[in-house]
């Protein structure tokens, strides 16, 4: 390889690192990030555009879900907005989330979607204000009503979505092993874990089962470009 080519590749590698493409500990590189500061959400595809908007929240632009969606033929989350073109297998999806429903509603929730293939086939992490067999779970929708797939027994998973404050989240999936981990606030210890390979890949997204809230500072890491 010519010396000039070596220099070019070295500079390209440095450029990728400067752009945020450095692989993390799991070997996943930054594929996309979105902070909504330009005031739009062109990269997002909501199931009901009338229920989503970008608003100024104390000087920061955020992506807000303003109303619950309509129930479908299967029991599943009613509102989602998918990150267009972000079809991944193994990934790390992180950001900030806030539930805006009255905290007195203990079953309030916000959801993180992944491996979304169509409205009847996807996974979701259900961060909630209480824990039982259907709240604060990792759920699978596979052509039928959602089922709980996380390992934590019903009612024992750690729930933290009990206020109207912002919470940091992270969802990690290893498509080869089926391992899924969901974190809220504490990025070192997952609150929900599962192992399932029913759906191998798909889009990621944000939303809720039947509540309102907002999202910001979203980042997606995965394999490839």
PLM segments and residue spans:
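Extracellular carbohydrate-recognition regions
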Residues: 24-49
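Short, aromatic/His-centered strand-loop micro-motif at the edge of beta-sheets
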Residues: 144-168
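Flexible glycan-contacting loops in extracellular carbohydrate-active proteins
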Residues: 192-216
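Secretory/extracellular carbohydrate-interaction modules
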Residues: 71-143
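Extracellular beta-strand elements of beta-rich domains used
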Residues: 36, 218-220
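Beta-strand-rich interaction surfaces with strong enrichment in secreted/lumenal proteins
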Residues: 79-86, 155-161, 205
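Short carbohydrate-recognition loop motifs
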Residues: 53-79
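Short tryptophan-centered beta-strand motifs in secreted/extracellular beta-sheet-rich domains
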Residues: 95, 164-175, 180-182
């Amino acid at each position: 390889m010519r010396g000039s080519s070596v220099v070019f590749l070295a500079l390209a590698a440095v450029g990728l690192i400067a752009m945020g493409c450095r692989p993390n500990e799991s070997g996943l590189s930054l594929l996309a990030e979105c902070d909504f500061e330009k005031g739009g959400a062109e990269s997002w595809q909501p199931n009901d555009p009338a229920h989503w908007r970008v608003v100024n929240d104390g000087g920061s632009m955020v992506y807000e879900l303003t109303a619950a969606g309509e129930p479908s033929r299967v029991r599943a989350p009613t509102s989602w907005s998918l990150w267009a073109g972000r079809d991944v297998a193994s990934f790390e999806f992180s950001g900030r989330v806030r539930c805006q429903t009255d905290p007195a509603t203990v079953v309030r929730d916000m959801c993180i979607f992944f491996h979304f293939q169509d409205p009847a086939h996807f996974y979701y992490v259900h961060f909630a204000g209480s824990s039982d067999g259907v709240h604060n779970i990792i759920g699978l929708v596979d052509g039928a009503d959602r089922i709980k797939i996380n390992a934590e027994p019903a009612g024992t998973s750690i729930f933290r979505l009990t206020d109207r404050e912002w919470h940091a989240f992270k969802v990690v999936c290893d498509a080869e092993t089926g391992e899924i981990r969901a974190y809220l606030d504490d990025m070192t210890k997952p609150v929900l874990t599962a192992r399932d390979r029913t759906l191998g890949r798909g889009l990621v997204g944000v939303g809720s089962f039947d509540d309102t809230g907002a999202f910001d500072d979203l980042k997606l890491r995965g394999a490839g470009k």
